[in-house]
């Protein structure tokens, strides 16, 4: 029997390499050409190359030229494919195939493969996560005397394989029947069926879907059948502000009303992450045939003023309902705007002299005095601040007040407030700032020189990608032979959100021909609170190719 057996599925990072083997048996290895074909999600079959096992001659598809090498070891009846410089679009199902004996290299087509095997190779981050759906019958369609019932779990739209589907059946015994199919889009779908017997009517079941390549897990808990129900209305209300300018905790009240009585679960999220806090949840109240309940979340001013989004998430009958809230942008009288900036990581961790700045813009010139007053939420005294006024070309006035803060005070989470008053303002403007809360992640730094470009022979561009850091506060410097360059020498973008939960920035530095001909070294340095041990991560790059 003819068999072609490939090496197992693998996950590789972008830029890495992978070696695939295909061992043949059941025929004379040197009599038939061996080749590889791949199918990426949402695409058709694509020929990569073939090899003549007898002579070692190869033929490669143009788009893979230079990135693929095919070899063979006739003594082991094995062909090898080495794929280099992997990209995200290299994630695909790869098929190893053989030709009819002694076929011409001009008539290769996919239908000529007598035997073939498939295996999936994935570039890290290029996978698609499964969507998971419970499959149940309507309760009214299940006979009252039924001794067993079948329910299912559908995982669809994922790539690559595999997923593992398991069930939590409590004290009941069950049997499962998994089935996997490849959809027209190139993604996979799996259905797992569970048949249970016994006292199943009031039992809840959990379907656990684990996507092995991405190391993600999705759980769905549901009952054996679905009933008609009225879904809840979810609304968040919050306590009123203190008009005296004080900063008491705020109360977020989540009202869940108008739903058919049944089990309900309420969870609070902060920027999409489950909050580990003590909640006050009222007991369910009946409203005729419907029910209502509520959950209360208390937030400190530090958290509320951090501009984070808070979500009340309600799980009911296998469905999710939610409402979200965040601090509204402060309204400013007469177009006046006030901004409060946090200290830069460079000032905080390198210079050890952090400052925060209160900036007031678009003030109309008048004889009255603009007062900027600093305070701390702890009530402790503040340092002496410096003040600067500047008249703009449009006739408005800009006022800046800079306050030195203690490094330890800032790191430990002190909240600072700037209060702006003026005789012509109907009310004071209040701004607060504190250390960003939430998860921490150190930056990844990649520095490289761009290729020379025609017409730019007197210059060379160095680039620095800094990514996957949290929170977003970061400082970027360039060093030339270990001497820091002025900020005016380079351009750095503002932090932007990645598709995940982190941030990234891109920095660009132009160097002269004289600098790179001296074989000088340039360093891109990122200063961030999560970097260890000294809050800095740096990468060196030489624009001289011989270095």
From Swiss-Prot:
Put simply, this protein is called: Immunoglobulin epsilon heavy chain
GO-annotated cellular components: extracellular region; immunoglobulin complex; plasma membrane
Q: What domain of life does the UniProt record list for this protein's source?
A: Eukaryota
What's one GO BP annotation on this UniProt entry? adaptive immune response
Q: Cell wall biogenesis/degradation among the record's keywords? A: no
Biological role: Immunoglobulins, also known as antibodies, are membrane-bound or secreted glycoproteins produced by B lymphocytes. In the recognition phase of humoral immunity, the membrane-bound immunoglobulins serve as receptors which, upon binding of a specific antigen, trigger the clonal expansion and differentiation of B lymphocytes into immunoglobulins-secreting plasma cells. Secreted immunoglobulins mediate the effector phase of humoral immunity, which results in the elimination of bound antigens.
InterPro entries annotated for this entry?
Answer: Ig-like_dom, Ig-like_dom_sf, Ig-like_fold, Ig/MHC_CS, Ig_C1-set, Ig_sub, Ig_V-set, Immune_Resp_Modulators
> Which PANTHER family is this protein grouped with?
TAPASIN
Gene3D superfamilies in the record: Immunoglobulins (2.60.40.10)
| Pfam families linked to this entry | C1-set, V-set
Q: What interactions and quaternary structure are annotated?
A: Immunoglobulins are composed of two identical heavy chains and two identical light chains; disulfide-linked.
Tell me where it resides: Secreted; Cell membrane
Primary residence: secreted
The record lists its disulfide bonds as 22-96, 139-225, 153-207, 254-312, 358-418, 464-524
Annotated region Constant (C) domain: the residues are: 125-547
Q: Write out the entry's keywords from A to Z.
A: Adaptive immunity, Cell membrane, Disulfide bond, Glycoprotein, Immunity, Immunoglobulin, Immunoglobulin domain, Membrane, Pyrrolidone carboxylic acid, Repeat, Secreted
Which SUPFAM superfamilies would you find in this protein's record? Immunoglobulin
Extract the ranges annotated as region (Variable (V) domain, involved in antigen recognition).
Answer: 1-124
List of residues that carry Pyrrolidone carboxylic acid: 1
Q: Does the keyword Glycoprotein apply?
A: yes
């Amino acid at each position: 029997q003819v068999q072609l057996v490939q090496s197992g599925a693998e996950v590789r990072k972008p830029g890495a390499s992978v070696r695939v083997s295909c061992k043949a048996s059941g025929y004379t290895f040197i009599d038939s050409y061996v080749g590889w074909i791949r199918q990426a999600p949402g695409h058709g079959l694509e020929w990569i190359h073939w090899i003549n096992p007898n002579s070692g001659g190869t033929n490669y598809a143009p788009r893979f030229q230079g990135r693929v090498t095919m070899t063979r070891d006739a003594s082991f009846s094995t062909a090898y494919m080495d794929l280099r410089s992997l990209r995200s679009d290299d994630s695909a199902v790869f098929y190893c195939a053989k030709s009819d004996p002694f076929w011409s290299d001009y008539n290769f087509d996919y239908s000529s493969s007598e035997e073939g095997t498939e295996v999936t190779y994935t570039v890290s981050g290029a996978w698609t996560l499964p969507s998971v759906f419970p499959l149940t019958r309507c309760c009214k369609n299940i006979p009252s005397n039924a001794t067993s019932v079948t329910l299912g779990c559908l995982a669809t739209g994922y790539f690559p394989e595999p997923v593992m589907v398991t069930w939590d059946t409590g004290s009941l015994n069950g049997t499962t029947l998994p089935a996997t199919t490849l959809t027209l889009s190139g993604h996979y779908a799996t259905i797992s069926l569970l048949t249970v017997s016994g006292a199943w009517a009031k039992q809840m079941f959990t379907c656990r879907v684990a996507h092995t390549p991405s190391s993600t897990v999705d759980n769905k808990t549901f009952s054996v059948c679905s009933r008609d129900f009225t879904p809840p209305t979810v609304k968040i209300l919050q306590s009123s502000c203190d008009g005296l300018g004080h900063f008491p905790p705020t109360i977020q009240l989540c009202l869940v009303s108008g739903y058919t009585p049944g089990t309900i679960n309420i969870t609070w999220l902060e920027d999409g992450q489950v909050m580990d806090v003590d909640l006050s949840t009222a007991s369910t109240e009946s409203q005729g045939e419907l029910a209502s309940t509520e959950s209360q979340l208390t937030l400190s001013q530090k958290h509320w003023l951090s501009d984070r989004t808070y979500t009340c998430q309600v799980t009911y009958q296998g469905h999710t309902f939610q409402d979200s809230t965040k601090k509204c942008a402060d309204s400013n009288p007469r177009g006046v705007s006030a901004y409060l900036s946090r200290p830069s990581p460079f000032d905080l961790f390198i210079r050890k002299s952090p400052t925060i700045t209160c900036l007031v813009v678009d003030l109309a010139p008048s004889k009255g005095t603009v007062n900027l007053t600093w305070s701390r939420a702890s009530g402790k005294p503040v340092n002496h601040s410096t003040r600067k006024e500047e008249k703009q070309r449009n006739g408005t006035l800009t006022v800046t007040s800079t306050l030195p803060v203690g490094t330890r005070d800032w790191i430990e989470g002190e909240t600072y407030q700037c209060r702006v008053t003026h005789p012509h303002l109907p009310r004071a403007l209040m701004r607060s700032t504190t250390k960003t809360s939430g998860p921490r992640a150190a930056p990844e730094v990649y520095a490289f020189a761009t290729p020379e470009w025609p017409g730019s022979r007197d210059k060379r561009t160095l680039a620095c990608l800094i990514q996957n850091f949290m929170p977003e506060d970061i400082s970027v410097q360039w060093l030339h032979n270990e001497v820091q360059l002025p900020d005016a020498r380079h351009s750095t973008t503002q932090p932007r959100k990645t598709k995940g939960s982190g941030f990234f920035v891109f920095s660009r530095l132009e160097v002269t021909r004289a600098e790179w001909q001296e074989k000088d070294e340039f360093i891109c340095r990122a200063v961030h609170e999560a970097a260890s041990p000294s809050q800095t991560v740096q990468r060196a790059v030489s624009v001289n190719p011989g270095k």
